Curated annotation (Swiss-Prot):
PROSITE patterns: ZF_RING_2, ZF_SIAH. It comes from Caenorhabditis elegans. This is E3 ubiquitin-protein ligase siah-1. Interacts with tir-1. Its EC number is 2.3.2.27.
Length: 419
């Protein structure tokens, strides 16, 4: 086996040199039989080229790379000169697209540092390494086109949302999301039986993919692992806002910037008070049935909605009425976490208070009322603080980063003196 550097075993090159010498003799014999001046010039040109090429090949057999002779193309130099593969591994592995000739390449070469191994490499019997492209899935380094192509595999053909595990496919391999599958009688793609075979391989791939938020078209720039995607979307500040008024009569949805305009245009009866401390006066609290009282409070360049809701509790033993008071911010949950509200009932040396973080209108007040995560009291307690059927609630809203105001009668540990 020959050495690519020409350090020994140059039999291949000697054969080529001998062939070129014979060609040179043929050129000289042809030129001796010619007496024309033009052929003589041609003879000199061929003779010089042949001598130069022979000298270059001799130099290369001694370890010097041959230059391309004038008048002869690189392709002509390749004829009969392709060396055998070296027995010793190269110092650097290259991903080559083209033909290797005398230690050079005729096309683009992408080199890797010595000792490194490219991704997905396989070695053939001739010692040539073939390299398959490594495409990152949904992570840094993947192009937008490749990421979009991979994500398209997870699109449900019915709702066009991204499917989350578990993945169920039909006998033909067609997928449908878990939300749409119970509503289908057959596969929406091939009309075969409803997808019922679990695709475990796709679930493993999904663990490496970052899925965009459902509301990315509305401006959300975040991507998530499939396990965190649903939780984020429930509180994403880019999701459509529902009408914050209690009750199910208004089905409006829109952007955050449109909420106040909707309230002023559709719910004109709602009163807005300015300031951090106001009195929320609910009139006619003795009205039968379920009743809601709503008021707006504007401060710190934000708008808050105050809700007092009365519900009938149909207990066969003792029917009662319950009141629930809560404050929600016209904004996101992240913004709501910057504030604290305080509700207080006081009359005849009695006082009842509640302090908490405002609810975001994304969260609504339904869950807070169901869990009694608000100021809750029954009709008997309401009568203790009401006057002529009207109930006044003191509402104070404070920023968390500012000292909160205290009631004059409240004492803290710092106010106590010890002997």
């Amino acid at each position: 086996m020959s050495n690519r550097n020409g350090g020994g075993g140059g039999g291949d090159y000697q054969d080529v040199i001998e062939s070129l010498r014979r060609t040179q003799l043929i050129f000289e014999e042809d030129d001796n039989n010619s007496s024309d001046s033009a052929p003589q010039a041609n003879h000199l040109s061929r003779h010089q080229t042949s001598n130069s090429l022979v000298e270059d090949m001799v130099n290369h057999s001694n370890g010097n790379p041959p230059p391309v002779p004038p008048g002869i193309t690189q392709q002509q130099c390749q004829i009969g000169l392709t060396p055998r593969m070296s027995a010793s591994p190269p110092s650097a592995v290259s991903t080559i697209s083209g033909t290797a000739v005398l230690g050079k390449t005729m096309a683009r070469v992408q080199s890797n540092p010595p000792g490194s191994i490219p991704h997905n490499t396989t070695t053939t019997a001739q010692g040539i390494q073939s390299v398959a492209p490594h495409i990152p899935i949904g992570g840094g380094g993947a192009t937008d086109d490749s990421s979009a192509e991979i994500l398209s595999v997870f699109e449900c053909p019915v709702c066009l949302e991204y499917m989350l595990p578990p993945y169920m496919q039909c006998s033909s391999g067609h997928l449908v999301c878990s939300n749409c599958r119970p509503k289908l009688q057959c596969c929406p793609t091939c009309r075969g039986p409803t997808p019922s075979v679990r695709n475990l391989g796709l679930e493993k791939i999904a663990n490496t993919v970052r899925f965009p938020c459902k509301f990315s078209t509305s401006g959300c720039p975040l991507n998530f692992h499939h396990a965190d995607k649903t939780e984020h979307e429930e509180l994403c500040e880019f999701r459509p806002y529902c009408c914050p008024c209690p009750g199910a009569s208004c089905k409006w949805q829109g952007g955050l910037s449109d909420v106040m305009e909707h309230l002023k245009k559709i719910h004109k009866s709602i009163t807005t008070l300015q300031g951090e401390d106001i009195v929320f006066l609910a009139t006619d609290i003795n009205l039968p049935g379920a009743v809601d009282w709503v008021m707006m409070q504007s401060c710190f360049d934000y708008n808050f909605m105050l809700v007092l809701e009365k519900q009938e509790k149909y207990d066969p033993a003792q029917p009662t009425q319950m009141f629930y008071a809560v404050v929600q911010l016209i904004g996101s949950k992240k913004e709501a976490d910057n504030f604290v509200y305080r509700l207080e009932l006081s009359a005849s040396r009695r006082r009842m208070s509640w302090e908490a973080t405002p609810r975001s209108i994304h969260e609504g007040v339904v869950v807070a009322i169901q869990q009694s995560d608000c100021l809750a009291f029954d009709s008997n307690a309401a009568q203790l603080f009401a006057e002529n059927g009207n109930l006044g609630i003191n509402v104070t809203i404070s920023r968390i980063d500012t000292p909160q105001r205290r009631h004059p009668n409240e004492l803290e540990n710092s106010d106590l003196e010890y002997d």
